[in-house]
């Protein structure tokens, strides 16, 4: 069977020796298969590869059939989110980090080659991961990449000081809250910051968004799962200096002022992730997060 994906990009975490070594090994293997390979600019600079085709993430998204991301979940988040802004290019994650929840292919040499060979031939399963976009009412010039989240959009307190917010869903008042913040998470992000704050785990294919309070000063504040078609408006009602901060997947911090409105809704783009044919999301929950693990 011929390869389904012929032009392959490699994107690696920068300044990490074991990632650079994996990129070089991966490049040699793909070259043996007769595939056209493009390496992301900074990734190539970290390796000893010479005379290789290089490109930016935007160019990769527009020119390649598939992108292989080598590193941890953080690197996968950043790269896949940016790639998805420019095209529908599918992404394969190889784990060279700690947890490897999103980068589902193990870096074991023999198993990796077999898995990659099958996926590049088209023998794979696919997950479509939804994203969120946000707008701050007085920050209309924010770059697009600073407004799109694959995991979550979080509004958090500075230096642990409580603040107040008011939430509307689809134009209707939902709730007020005082506490350390609020996380608005995708199903993908439900196993990240949102889970640590007590939120539920959502299947990545679920068409939902979850709102998770962070240390709400209330005995009856609970996470709320809503349709991902809903539009969420969050108003900052009061705070103690310094101001609360809005972050996108843990990056791009924006200072928020009293009475500012943050609008969050589903993004048009999705991240397409390729896995092995036998990939099972619930296996990942058990193996990576110890879900339902028998303790005694």
Curated annotation (Swiss-Prot):
GO biological process per UniProt: NAD metabolic process; NADP biosynthetic process
Active-site annotation: 73
Family statement drawn from the similarity comment of this UniProt entry: Belongs to the NAD kinase family.
Cited Pfam families: NAD_kinase (PF01513), NAD_kinase_C (PF20143)
Listed HAMAP family: NAD_kinase (MF_00361)
Keywords in alphabetical order: ATP-binding, Cytoplasm, Kinase, NAD, NADP, Nucleotide-binding, Transferase
Function summary: Involved in the regulation of the intracellular balance of NAD and NADP, and is a key enzyme in the biosynthesis of NADP. Catalyzes specifically the phosphorylation on 2'-hydroxyl of the adenosine moiety of NAD to yield NADP.
Record SUPFAM superfamilies: NAD kinase/diacylglycerol kinase-like (SSF111331)
PANTHER family: NAD KINASE (PTHR20275:SF0)
Cofactor(s) named in the record: a divalent metal cation
One Gene Ontology molecular-function label: NAD+ kinase activity
Positions bound to NAD(+): 73-74, 78, 151-152, 178, 180, 191-196
Protein name: NAD kinase
């Amino acid at each position: 069977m011929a390869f389904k994906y012929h032009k392959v990009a490699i994107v690696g975490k920068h300044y990490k020796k074991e990632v650079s070594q994996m990129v070089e090994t991966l490049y040699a293997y793909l070259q043996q298969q007769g595939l056209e390979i493009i390496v992301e600019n900074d990734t190539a600079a970290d390796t000893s590869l010479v005379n290789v085709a290089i490109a930016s993430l935007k160019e990769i998204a527009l020119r390649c059939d598939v992108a292989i991301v080598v590193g941890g979940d953080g690197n996968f988040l950043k790269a896949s989110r940016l790639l998805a802004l420019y095209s529908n290019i599918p992404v394969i994650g190889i784990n060279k980090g700690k947890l490897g929840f999103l980068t589902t292919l193990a870096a074991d040499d023999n198993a990796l080659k077999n898995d990659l060979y099958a996926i590049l031939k088209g023998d794979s399963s696919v997950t479509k991961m939804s994203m969120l976009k946000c707008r701050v009412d007085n920050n209309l010039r924010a770059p697009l990449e600073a407004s799109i989240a694959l995991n979550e959009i979080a509004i958090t307190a500075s230096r642990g000081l409580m603040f107040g917010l008011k939430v509307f869903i689809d134009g209707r008042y939902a709730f007020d809250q005082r506490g350390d913040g609020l996380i608005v998470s995708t199903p993908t992000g439900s196993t990240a910051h949102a889970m640590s704050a007590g939120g539920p785990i959502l299947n990545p294919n679920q068409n939902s968004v979850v709102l998770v309070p962070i240390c709400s000063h209330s005995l009856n504040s609970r996470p709320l799962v809503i349709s991902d078609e809903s539009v969420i408006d969050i108003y900052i009602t009061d705070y103690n200096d310094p101001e609360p901060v809005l972050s996108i997947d843990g990056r791009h911090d924006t200072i928020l002022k009293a009475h500012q409105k943050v609008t969050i809704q589903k993004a048009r783009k999705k991240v397409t992730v390729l896995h092995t044919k036998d990939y099972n999301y619930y296996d990942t929950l058990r193996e990576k997060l110890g879900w339902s693990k028998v303790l005694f």
